[in-house]
């Protein structure tokens, strides 16, 4: 069975659906993994890391869509990607089926089996497939850093021989 990872084409998206560690595990289980060249560059993962893990680097995303039985993406496929998906394949992604009804209809019409990663239960049994927790954890961390950039005061307590600066007081609203 062939697993394909095309490069994310949504503007500003730097993530990739599979890391080299996962590729290595899949190859051990006798999957063939095709990854579009430079797919991991936004996440600072070069092609050689994927090759070392056993993936084949492909220069053309169309080839990946034509050959793969399973496509792994971060974002739901855009229309041009959806057209490339072959009938009776599988798609793993943050599909957002409650927001993307037309996408769900298109996937259904092509007899594609879709797995929406953010809807996998966050339980012990499904923990290895819990992609949402890692993403919300990173988003929350980044939100704090971005918020800190807008504070006109020094964030942590600073004690030096020259004096003490009290830490900023902030209120964080939300959970993720």
Please give the residue ranges for each predicted region.
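An N-terminal-biased, well-structured beta-alpha scaffold segment characteristic
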Residues: 2-112
């Amino acid at each position: 069975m062939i697993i394909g990872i095309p490069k994310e084409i949504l503007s500003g998206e730097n993530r990739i659906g599979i890391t080299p560690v996962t590729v290595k595990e899949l190859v051990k289980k006798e999957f063939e993994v095709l990854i579009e060249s430079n797919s991991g560059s936004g996440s600072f993962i070069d092609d050689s890391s994927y090759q070392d893990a056993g993936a084949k680097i492909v220069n053309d995303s169309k080839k990946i869509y034509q050959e793969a039985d399973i496509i792994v993406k971060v974002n739901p496929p855009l229309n041009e990607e959806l057209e490339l998906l072959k009938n009776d394949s599988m798609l793993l992604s943050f599909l957002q089926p409650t927001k993307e009804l037309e996408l769900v209809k298109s996937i259904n019409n092509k007899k594609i089996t879709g797995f929406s990663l953010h809807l996998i239960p966050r339980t012990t049994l499904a923990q290895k497939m819990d992609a949402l927790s890692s993403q919300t954890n990173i988003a929350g961390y980044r939100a704090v850093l971005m918020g800190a950039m807008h504070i006109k005061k020094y964030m942590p307590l600073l004690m030096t021989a020259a004096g003490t600066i009290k830490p900023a007081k902030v209120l964080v609203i939300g959970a993720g």
